[in-house]
Amino acid sequence: MAGTGSFKVTRISEGAVKPAAATPEETLPLAWVDRYPTHRGLVESMHIFRSGADAAPGVIRDALARALVFFYPLAGRIVEPEAGSPAIRCTADGVYFAEAAADCSLEDVRFLERPLLLPKEDLVPYPGDDRWGVEPHNTIMMMQITKFTCGGFVMGLRFNHASADGMGAAQFINAVGDMARGLPEPRVKPVWDREKFPNPSIKPGPLPGLPVLALDYIVLDFPTGYIDGLKAQYKAHSGKFCSGFDVLTAKLWQCRTRALNLEPGATVKLCFFASVRHLLKLDRGYYGNSIFPVKMSAPSETVLSSSVMEVVDMIRQAKERMAVEFFQFAKEETEQDPFQMTFNYESIYVSDWSKLGFAEVDYGFGPPKFAGPLVNNDFIASVVILKAPLPLDGTRMLASCVTKEHSEEFVRGMKEDLP
């Protein structure tokens, strides 16, 4: 495993971690949303801990085996008994787990702030067919613990979106933490219940084209006090409450639209996914995908001429429409695939990781300094909102949403009223 510059990561061990006790052998159907073609892939994330390196590999390996007894489908494989209908075969074959060691401290690599001073391929597992023998889109989860000389460690995780959404993946990782701290069972017991998600006859639309956009990578931090101030402004504007996500996303959409300097009459789009757990009254332990897109489209002039608070109004109205649109989808009152996306430079996609639960995971060494996705692509203009790394207080944006040509104006707008 090659490092960057003088730093090197060496793999110590690898193999399958299987459930610690016998589990049912069965094939479980996935929900409509789980089966969606774009969800058949591994989401990569990085979880950085300041201490615990010596004990972490053994503790987490053992806890993983015990957690898989409760979450036994995750120890299986994705199969496709019928074309277009993937399912999980509960084989107890296990989760890929690797232990590695870096010859540097976390401080040496700036706690893996961007740009990374170690390749992500050294931090998250890419075993290849010769060492794992399972195609990535049929693998449910892979994990790697990398120890650093300072006593800290990094968990690199690859989790198949077909098996769980972000909240479900965090539920499982928290269950591993529960086992690591000696609990006899997870605090939140898993529930399958995939049949409770609607299963309309709507066919997924064709996969969209993916343009190469050559996006810049930008990190922005917003203190809690600043976000609270924006929320207070919205309360004064409307008499209603809003979330930090609402105000930051409104500011983001407006600043990005201004930075793009589009031709008059251009349409700009914003999309994010919202949970429908409350609409379906799902059990707290449900860990499958339970998301639905919230989409907005407006002339660029409208976004630019509105105040940030008026853009918040637009976002909140779209969130309110989501419930109606979801039940239209569930009752097959529409023939359109609501998950069909348009990927062009005028469209932006926002993902909220701030409340999923990854930042609260504790394996007995305290919560992570940072937990977030390893996303940096050149074909989807996207932003991830998540908790700022400790000891910072507030929210971080990981933005891959503008080209270098537009990044200076975008950053200037986002920072112009920061304290």
From Swiss-Prot:
Q: What start-end ranges are recorded for coiled-coil regions in this protein?
A: none
Q: Which GO terms describe its molecular function?
A: hydroxycinnamoyltransferase activity
Write down the Pfam families for this protein, in alphabetical order.
Answer: Transferase (PF02458)
Keywords (A to Z) from UniProt: Acyltransferase, Transferase
Signal peptide position in this chain?
Answer: none
Indicate the enzyme's highest-level EC class: transferase
What positions does UniProt annotate as the active site of this protein? Answer: H161, D362
Q: Which superkingdom, per the lineage?
A: Eukaryota
**Enzyme Commission no:** 2.3.1.-
Q: What does this protein do?
A: Involved in the incorporation of ferulate into the cell wall. May act as arabinoxylan feruloyl transferase.
Family as reported in the entry's similarity comment: Belongs to the plant acyltransferase family.
Q: Could you identify this protein by its name? A: Acyl transferase 9
Gene encoding this chain? AT9
